Amino acid sequence: MKVELKDKERIDDLQRNGYQIIQNPEKFCFGMDAVLLTGFAHAREKDILLDLGTGTGIIPLLMEAKYHCSHLTGLEIQEESADMARRSVALNDLQDRIDIVTGDIKEADRIFQAASFDCITCNPPYMIGQHGLTNPEEPKAIARHEVLCTLEDVVSRTAKLLKPGGHFYMVHRPFRLAEIMTMLVKYKLEPKRMQRVYPYIDKEPNMVLIEAVRGGRSRMTVEKPLIVYQSPGVYMPEIYDIYGY
């Protein structure tokens, strides 16, 4: 379906099923973290999936391309981003499979029915509070800093919305790993799988991918590290596979 592009917007190829996404580089474009999260996550065709803080809809689009889930929903508080996500859904003729809802993560348990999702994904803001921000209202600030929601907001709402045995997938920063694990256990989301992401083999990890299961048993697998670059500008083969090249 043809859709209208607004000022400064562009259409990018997602390298999956011919899908495309509308983005505005002056606002916020999806990053590698969202792509790696979809490479780490698993879903089944019968699953009903929710993406919290969906932005321009990158995670629902990629998860639909990979797993053809029964239905996917993206929740996004910023109307401009939600509008781009809806138009991207229409651009790919996926209106019958993906819904984009404008709303606050803190209100997610009021927007959606309890225990109604098999799988929940989230690429949340990583940075605590508004430290160093000149304009907390900017879309990039809202996406990167806990201006409008906190880690606990994400985890507590996920715990209410996941079905028993449902899976939660999140990408975050290693410096908050202790807090993340404590929060997951507090809300009875048992950490089951973790993978650290390193920019180069000789550098410290700068991302961590986590899977938790609602009501799961206490046992976690730490997967082998994921290395992004073999040299500047050249991805490792695993990264090319995740991107679909």
Regions found by a protein language model. Give the residues of each.
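Short loop/edge segments at beta-strand edges and connector loops
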Residues: 23, 102-103, 172, 195
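Mobile active-site "lid"/loop adjacent to the S-adenosyl-L-methionine
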Residues: 124-153
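Conserved Class I SAM-dependent methyltransferase catalytic core
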Residues: 148-199, 203-205
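Conserved SAM/SAH cofactor-binding pocket of Class I
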Residues: 40-133, 156
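Class I SAM-dependent transferase core
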Residues: 2-45
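SAM/dcSAM-binding transferase cores
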Residues: 204-245
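Conserved beta-strand segments of alpha/beta enzyme cores
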Residues: 20, 71, 97-99, 190-193
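Short, structurally constrained coil/turn elements
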Residues: 15, 43, 94, 185-188
